[in-house]
């Protein structure tokens, strides 16, 4: 089997998995404030139903750029976003939550946002709503014709037994290996025809290798070896325990044998992207 590898150096990439299923990488960024890369975020579109996996900074703007309203090709808009899955509670994966809660509602979303993630995500969402209470009340009770539901959310905590299923997809969570962070997960998305696995932030993970076998697409994080070697020893220890080197990822890919390997959340630390 020939392994295809996609390096994600632009701000988003679209892959037509099937005619009715598309994967868009909205952001490949990290905590480093690279102006060319938005925060970690992925859009899986199945029969015109969007599912977000992580929602780093810039997620709504990148999503909007794909829509017909803002010059793209997708016929949906931000009001369609009502399912979002979070791998873990690190800020580079959830800084876009306030935008995800507020902006689609302002644009007309009436459905509650369905949030799936670790402990703490519900508290974060509640606190965002509290922080924007003035703005929300102004829009509802002022002269704007705004609905009273679209900024609200429903939360379901994920664990290694988590399963979500609707008419389009089945989603399962698995524990990965993000150092000393206990609640850190990857996701398996399955339709009738395809299997897409998102590693989340992780060092090499035996569980990932097991569940990702023969995936159609494996989206996996990686760091630059040359950038890593420039870090101080304490940071090298940290990153080696929390993330995946190119050599380690090559071994993972040879065991999993996905049809396509997509590299994301790429930690360069000033190294060249070449």
Where are these regions (language model features)?
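Positively charged n-region of N-terminal signal peptides that target proteins for export
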Residues: 1-5
